[in-house]
Amino acid sequence: MSEHEPALPYRDASLPVEDRVEDLLGRMTVAEKAGMLFQTMIAPGPIDEANPHMGLASGEHMIGEQLMSHFNVLGTAPDTTALAEWTNALQERASRTRLGIPVTLSTDPRNHFTDNVGTAARAGAFSQWPETLGLAAIGSADLVEAFADTVRQEYLAVGIRLALHPQVDLATEPRWSRIGGTFGEDAELSAELVAGYIRGFQGAELGPQSVSTMTKHFPGGGPQLDGEDPHFAYGREQVYPGDNFDYHLIPFRAAIAAGAAQMMPYYGMPVGTEHEEVAFAFNHGIITGLLREELGFAGIVCTDWGLVTDTSIMGQDMPARAWGLEHLDELSRVERILQAGCDQFGGEARPELVVELVEQGRITEDRIDASVRRLLREKFVLGLFEQPYVDAGAASGIVGRADFVAAGEAAQRHAFTVLTNVEETLPVRSPRPRLYVEGVDPEVAAAYGEVVADPASADVALVRMQTPYEPRPGGFEAMFHAGSLDIPADEVERLRALALAVPTVLDMHLDRPAILTGVVDAVAALVASFGGSDAAFLDVVFGQALPEGRLPFDLPRSMAAVEASRSDVPYDTEDPLFRFGHGLTYPSGP
């Protein structure tokens, strides 16, 4: 829009939002409306350059030619000034489209430790907190709200206005690869924490200082057949052998009550329920019948990424996740998603398909308008038309601010969960003990004791490990930790031998509920963590910080117990080694 063009009603901030929406909607072509319905990935960099590695067109093409205005920012951000300058460049390009509709930028979580292009980015310059499982281990809704408020400020500083989270799936199937992003197994705890999460990001109501939230994955991922993930065809079935479908809705009801602005359905298809056996975003009974009509959700529904177009991610061929409807062509997939009641297509850039559906009379323009209204309304409410740009020079003073970093580091320490502590091994009180370390940076450990190479000469061994998993092939698929939760037998033998030679503190990072039966009786202390630095771990070991964590899920005793459990039922493995809520503590200080 030319700066010399007379002011248009949709540009007038004094008018009611609904009036501005209707004015702008009435000026839009079908192609412009279609562009609104797509949100895909974009990576910081020159906006006129494509990203073939991720199969992405350039920002210039998507904004200028495809008329898109919603993008999911990929990757860790080491330089927040550069990130803010890049978001401003996108907004400047959007300002030169016919109607000057500003861009809405979104992100997966980027304030934790996980780095997976499909689910989260490592914190980088942002404050670093425990994973959401760690927040659940602490169990304080006030802390979760403070976390979300901190992240809100960091997002705003670089122009990110939509959080593709929280993830409130319930960890009732211990093998599932996405547990690390949840609040654990308990529906009531998840419901309590998600309310604080949404308050912290959005405030009492959505406005210019808010970051909108997209709660996922409706109606609750987690009960996956054999724990396999529906990003992939072999994991497409979502099962309810315990007839416990409604249990998984509890956190979503809480999110809606807290004002959740957006909702994302999961990839899976329900099997053996009253609902049609097609993926949730294609499922009219789930989106319109359950989410819209029964639960009363009036916000934006955006599909999970990649339901329409076959693509390649990180060199791995990825078929469209049109589970139960794989036989449909792309045009019919788009039609079914719109008929189901979704507003936006995640991970897709195919507005021409919507235009074709309207031209063929298969989808009415009124139906498109209903979704565009919701999407435009949020842009207006967030104040993007008044202030699309950020102060790039100020970004680095807000992102990673000292008090934000300190709060994240304190939460890391509090989230550590002590499972066993034989003869009060913890905290280690010996001055400058000899330390044998595995999985711990020796340079960091050297500040706490003398690091030695031979366990036999050590006073204590400190070992940090990841939850076991069965590696999968492929660039993208390999990033999802699935399969067995057992520590391999040879590793159990090695750890037991180490623990026999020297008192051993074993810290297991739990992105899934590991089976620790083979080592629990051998180590001097067993600790669970959910995203914590080596310094945080050592502070807990040496009593300089107080561990406050309680398990956010049961830890099963065996894989046989996992395999025999019902995927949709919490606390269902027989005779678990440790129960939900277990955690020991001890006084801090020297």
Region spans (language model):
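A general structural motif
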Residues: 51-52, 242-249, 326, 439, ...
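A glycine-rich phosphate-binding loop feature that marks nucleotide/adenosyl-phosphate handling sites
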Residues: 40-41, 109-110, 169-170, 213-221, ...
